[in-house]
Swiss-Prot record:
<comment type="similarity">
    <text>Belongs to the RuBisCO large chain family. Type I subfamily.</text>
</comment>
<feature type="binding site" description="in homodimeric partner">
    <location>
        <position position="116"/>
    </location>
    <ligand>
        <name>substrate</name>
    </ligand>
</feature>
<keyword id="KW-0120">Carbon dioxide fixation</keyword>
<keyword id="KW-0560">Oxidoreductase</keyword>
<keyword id="KW-0479">Metal-binding</keyword>
<dbReference type="InterPro" id="IPR036376">
    <property type="entry name" value="RuBisCO_lsu_C_sf"/>
</dbReference>
<feature type="binding site">
    <location>
        <position position="320"/>
    </location>
    <ligand>
        <name>substrate</name>
    </ligand>
</feature>
<dbReference type="Pfam" id="PF02788">
    <property type="entry name" value="RuBisCO_large_N"/>
</dbReference>
<feature type="site" description="Transition state stabilizer">
    <location>
        <position position="327"/>
    </location>
</feature>
<feature type="binding site" description="via carbamate group">
    <location>
        <position position="194"/>
    </location>
    <ligand>
        <name>Mg(2+)</name>
    </ligand>
</feature>
<feature type="binding site">
    <location>
        <position position="288"/>
    </location>
    <ligand>
        <name>substrate</name>
    </ligand>
</feature>
<keyword id="KW-0113">Calvin cycle</keyword>
<feature type="binding site">
    <location>
        <position position="170"/>
    </location>
    <ligand>
        <name>substrate</name>
    </ligand>
</feature>
<dbReference type="InterPro" id="IPR036422">
    <property type="entry name" value="RuBisCO_lsu_N_sf"/>
</dbReference>
<dbReference type="Pfam" id="PF00016">
    <property type="entry name" value="RuBisCO_large"/>
</dbReference>
<dbReference type="InterPro" id="IPR020888">
    <property type="entry name" value="RuBisCO_lsuI"/>
</dbReference>
<keyword id="KW-0503">Monooxygenase</keyword>
Length: 473
């Protein structure tokens, strides 16, 4: 073995971290970055800089490099690709040895991949487009507390998507009035109701009073309908200790499901709560508040497909996924891609959906995607087609905005859903024939008829900001 020597000074990153001859190992963690360099900076140099600054490198050589096997531990920029339709940036593919990351710690992975490197001056912008977690690393993560099949067994609901509703107005209701709205929605035919992401424990409605009134409403609706019901009680709190206190109380009063804002709450808190839910038989609903700050800019940040993978590994039984057809951002093909990431055991590379790597989740349970945001009964045929059975279709204003009240809004959604599922099971092209399916169903449901009349002109026809790269469409 050749003796190591130390040569002080600064050398180009590409001398150490640009390795186009490298063949990634099955155990490597692979990352695809969309890199927008400063003018005049060579692609190979800036790709190598990303690999260096997200792994072992710093701005100068250091003598302590001699005390380790730097060639083993370093990140390696091994491939560069053009971004179709955009000559201001390029894709840089980086391989990291698995030993760089603490087992089961999404916190540690993100600290490296999206840490200081995102402030590097040689970059105008940087976006983490996708990550391939090796199966050896996946197996160190807890994943969803229960998964889709266990949830169906707990809730005793099969053969269709689940129906939910976010209680509105999201802020300002007293606990008793909040519970009343929950009861009316569940009695009307929904499976779940939900706290909104910013409902925690404010002066107008403290968490414990909300939990009590909501659970009373849930149990009353269960008795009257003979169906299992639930409400996502948001336990997101200022401290982990307070979060667990709220979770314990939810369990004590008999709630089947709690909720966490995983990005604002953080991955450390989320992984801990997922572990607690697994141990205590509680389902865990995950809201993605703050995601658009990270993922909406097509040149800088973290793509939602990465945040989806991280959540599946960290733990959650539900995750908000966008709707494609509602009021929130969401390219159809990209959304189908991260729905697959949530639910499937193995996801093949598919550039048409923005998926840059194969991803193997082994036997890890799937996460149920939640379609929520500006949807109503006219969207039901498209939602059933896009999301399939293993999903939650969540209508907030599309339930509570019904002219006849909350229970009627819930009934309209339930009738619309069951009509679409029945038609699909008969082989009808539901999305194509949606209008006729709903019109026929409305002949025996005045609630649905009024809902269709109320929202027939409501559309959210804005262009998607974060589109898939054009040549992959």
């Amino acid at each position: 073995m050749a003796a190591k020597t130390y040569n002080a000074g600064v050398k180009e990153y590409r001398q150490t971290y640009w390795t186009p001859e490298y063949t990634p190992k099955d155990t490597d963690l692979l990352a695809c970055f969309k890199v927008t360099p400063q003018p005049g900076v060579a692609r190979e140099e800036v790709a190598a800089a990303v690999a260096a600054e997200s792994s072992t490198g710093t701005w100068t050589t250091v003598w302590t490099d001699l005390l380790t096997d730097l060639d083993y531990y370093k990140g390696r920029a091994y491939r560069i690709e053009d971004v179709p339709g955009d000559d201001t940036c390029f894709y840089a593919f980086v391989a990291y040895p698995i030993d760089l990351f603490e087992e089961g710690s999404i916190v540690n992975v993100l600290t490296s991949l999206v840490g200081n490197v995102f402030g590097f001056k040689a970059l105008r912008a940087l976006r983490l487009e996708d990550v391939r977690f090796p199966i050896a690393y996946v197996m160190t993560c807890g994943g969803p507390p229960h998964g889709i099949q266990v949830e169906r067994d707990i809730m005793n609901k099969y053969g269709r998507p689940l129906l939910g509703c976010t209680i509105k107005p999201k802020l300002g209701l007293s606990a008793k009035n909040y519970g009343r709205a929950v009861y009316e929605c569940l009695r009307g035919g929904l499976d779940f109701t939900k706290d909104d992401e910013n409902v925690n424990s404010q002066p107008f409605m403290r968490w414990k009073q909300r939990f009590d009134f909501v659970q009373e409403a849930t149990e009353k609706a269960q008795r009257e309908t003979g169906e299992r019901k639930g409400h996502y009680l948001n336990v997101t709190a200022p401290t982990p200790e307070e979060m667990y206190k709220r979770a314990e109380y939810a369990k004590e009063i008999g709630a089947p499901i709690i909720m966490h804002d995983y990005l604002t709450g953080g991955f450390c808190a989320n992984t801990g709560l997922a572990n607690w839910c697994r141990d205590n038989g509680m389902l865990l609903h995950i809201h993605r508040a703050m995601h658009a700050v990270l993922d909406r800019n097509p040149h800088h940040g973290i793509h939602f497909r990465v945040l989806t993978k991280c959540l599946r590994l960290s733990g959650g039984d539900h995750l908000h996924s966008g709707t494609v057809v509602g009021k929130l951002e969401g390219d159809r093909d990209a959304t189908l891609g991260w729905i697959d990431i949530m639910r499937d055991d193995f996801i093949k590379e598919d550039r048409s959906r923005g998926i840059m790597f194969d991803q193997d989740f082994g036997s890890m349970p799937g996460v149920m995607p939640v379609a929520s945001g500006g949807i109503h009964v006219w969207h039901m045929p498209a939602l059933v087609t896009i999301f399939g059975d293993d999903s939650v279709l969540q209508f907030g204003g599309g339930t509570l905005g019904h002219p006849w009240g909350n229970a009627a809004g819930a009934a309209a959604n339930r009738v619309a859903l069951e009509a679409c599922v029945e038609a699909r099971n008969k082989g009808v092209a539901v999305e194509k024939e949606g209008k006729s399916i709903l019109t026929e169903a409305a002949t025996h449901s005045p609630e649905l008829k009024i809902a269709m009349e109320t929202w027939k002109e409501i559309k959210f026809e804005f262009d998607t900001v974060d589109k898939l790269d054009v040549a992959h469409k």
